[in-house]
């Protein structure tokens, strides 16, 4: 009998349902209609449910920001190291879930009282333990995105993964790099949330956003690029392609006619003075010194192209 549907399309519908519910259920075709109808209307985070200590903290922070904010100020929020656990059994799972929900509540409340120029997630979204499977990784990503998205609606975002988002510890425990979560899942739950940015690589997610009104370039690096394919023993944090893109992105910014009026922010999970991420730090130092770098046989000179700081 001829099929009246494409299996990939059915899988896409199931994925969409799970993204909306934050769950990890599987569905037969006959169950999908009921599953869609059961998705609750409105927001999951109600202001009435936000604890007083969160509201008080947000109000105090908002007052401090307002006291120093000027027309040229850049206001943003960063989140990192949620280590979301979902169904993983840990001694501190309850604290993780409570803390992450309250953090998402705080971001939603803050976004209602302070206009945010952008938001960034700097990695280690997932629990990423040696027993964390790819299915658990996906469930953790879906639930956390479901919680945080209400506070970030309409705000330019930049997401980058951390070492606990690669599956490298599960791969090491099982003795097989085939158990890494893979580039496709990293793209789905991190890189794709950078939509609207100027990508160096849509798959790896490194990109930049310009805020012309504030004369700011936000450069988003993937400092675990090597670990996504090579695991915890990967020699390089950033590929040559990413390092070259980083150098060219800095040179492009420094070449602007009004570059001295511009600034930049660099995002990533690892700082650029740590481990093999230092290769990125060398690019940055060469830029600040007005020197040059040669990467993969290509030389980028920053002479006269380093006005932006």
Q: What do the PLM-derived regions correspond to, one by one?
A:
Residues 131-245:
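Extended active-site neighborhood of metal-dependent phosphoesterases/phosphodiesterases
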Residues 1-64:
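Surface-exposed receptor/substrate recognition regions of extracellular proteins
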Residues 81, 123-124, 162-163, 269, ...:
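Active-site glycine-centered loops adjacent to acidic/histidine catalytic or metal-binding residues
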Residues 73-87, 215-229, 267:
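Active-site-proximal beta-strand elements of phosphoester/diester hydrolases
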Residues 105-118, 150-156, 215-220, 231-309:
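His/acidic metal-ligating clusters that form di-metal
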Residues 51-53, 57-136:
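N-terminal active-site segment of His-dependent metallophosphoesterases
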Residues 86-98, 129, 136, 173-200, ...:
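Surface-exposed intrinsically disordered loops and tails
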Residues 65-77, 204-220, 262:
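Beta-strand-turn-beta hairpins that frame and shape the catalytic cleft
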């Amino acid at each position: 009998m001829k099929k009246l549907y494409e299996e990939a399309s059915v899988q896409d519908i199931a994925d969409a349902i799970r993204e909306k519910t934050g769950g990890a259920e599987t569905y037969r075709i006959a169950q999908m209609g009921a599953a869609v109808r059961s998705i609750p209307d409105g927001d999951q985070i109600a202001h009435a449910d936000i604890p007083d200590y969160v509201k008080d903290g947000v109000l105090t922070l908002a007052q401090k920001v307002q006291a120093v904010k000027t027309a040229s100020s850049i206001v943003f929020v960063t989140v990192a190291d949620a280590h979301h656990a979902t169904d993983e059994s840990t001694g501190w799972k309850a604290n993780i879930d409570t803390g992450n929900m309250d953090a998402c509540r705080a971001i939603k409340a803050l976004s209602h009282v302070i206009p945010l120029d952008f938001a960034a997630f700097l990695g280690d979204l997932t629990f990423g333990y040696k027993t964390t499977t790819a299915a658990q990784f996906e469930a953790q990503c879906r639930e956390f995105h479901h919680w945080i998205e209400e506070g970030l609606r309409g705000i330019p975002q930049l997401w980058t993964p951390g070492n606990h988002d690669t599956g490298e510890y599960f791969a090491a425990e099982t003795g097989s790099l085939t158990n890494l979560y893979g580039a496709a899942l990293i793209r789905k739950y991190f890189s794709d949330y950078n939509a609207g940015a100027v990508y160096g690589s849509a798959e790896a997610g490194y990109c930049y956003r310009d805020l012309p009104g504030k004369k700011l370039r936000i450069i988003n690096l993937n400092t675990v690029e090597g670990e996504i394919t090579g695991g915890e023993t990967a020699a390089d944090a950033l590929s040559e392609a990413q390092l070259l893109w980083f150098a060219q992105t800095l040179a492009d910014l420094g070449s602007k006619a009004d570059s001295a009026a511009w600034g930049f922010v660099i995002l990533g999970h690892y700082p650029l003075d740590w481990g093999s991420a230092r290769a990125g730090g060398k690019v940055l130092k060469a830029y600040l010194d007005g020197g040059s770098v040669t990467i993969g046989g290509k030389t980028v000179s920053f002479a006269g192209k380093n006005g932006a700081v």
